[in-house]
Each structure stands twice: as C-alpha cells, then as structure tokens.
Amino acid sequence: MGKLTILVLVAAVLLSAQVMVQGDGDQPADRNAVPRDDNPGGASGKFMNVLRRSGCPWEPWCG
C-alpha cells in the first residue's frame, strides 16, 4: 500500500510539472490585464481631468 501511495504522489508531481511547463498558451499579462486608472483623484480628479481635456474656459478651475 505504501508503494502505491508513493507512485500516485510521484505521478501527480510529474503531471503538475508538465502543466506548469506547457501552460495553456495565454500570456498572464493579457489574461489578467487591469485597466489603467486615468483618474487617481477619484470623482473630483475625474472632473478636473475632463476640464483639462476639453480646454477649460476658466483658468482657476483647471489648476
């Protein structure tokens, strides 16, 4: 019974090593990409960012 357990463990290790080496063909950066935060200041930062992009008519608001 002990030899069977060791054989099963060795087979599991070899199989997991093969899966890690081969992978599934996708790049982790593509699959798990996180969108960039264009507005790190939250809602007020987003408002100021929109004003800057649209050509703010009032200079003190644009910063």
UniProtKB/Swiss-Prot annotation:
InterPro entries in alphabetical order: Conotoxin (IPR004214), Contryphan_CS (IPR011062)
This protein is called: Contryphan-R
Endpoints of the signal sequence? 1-23
Q: What is the reported tissue distribution?
A: Expressed by the venom duct.
Residues annotated as carrying D-tryptophan in the record are W58
Q: Which residues form the propeptide?
A: 24-54
Write out the PTM section of this UniProt entry.
The differences between contryphan-R and bromocontryphan lies in the state of bromination of Trp-61.
Q: Where in the cell is it found?
A: Secreted
Q: Please name every pair of cysteines joined by a disulfide bond in this record.
A: C56-C62
User: Which parts of the sequence carry 4-hydroxyproline?
Assistant: P57
Residues with Cysteine amide modification: C62
Q: Cite the entry's keywords alphabetically.
A: Amidation, Bromination, D-amino acid, Disulfide bond, Hydroxylation, Ion channel impairing toxin, Neurotoxin, Secreted, Signal, Toxin
Region annotation Disordered: residue ranges? Answer: 24-48
Similarity comment: Belongs to the O2 superfamily. Contryphan family.
Write out the GO MF terms: ion channel inhibitor activity; toxin activity
Misc:
Contryphan-R and [Des-Gly1]-contryphan-R exist in two forms, due to cis-trans isomerization at 56-Cys-hydroxyPro-57.
Q: Which residues carry this modification: 6'-bromotryptophan?
A: W61
Q: Which domain of life is it from?
A: Eukaryota
Q: Which species is listed as the source?
A: Conus radiatus
Q: What is known of its domains?
A: The cysteine framework is C-C.
What are the annotated GO cellular component locations? Answer: extracellular region
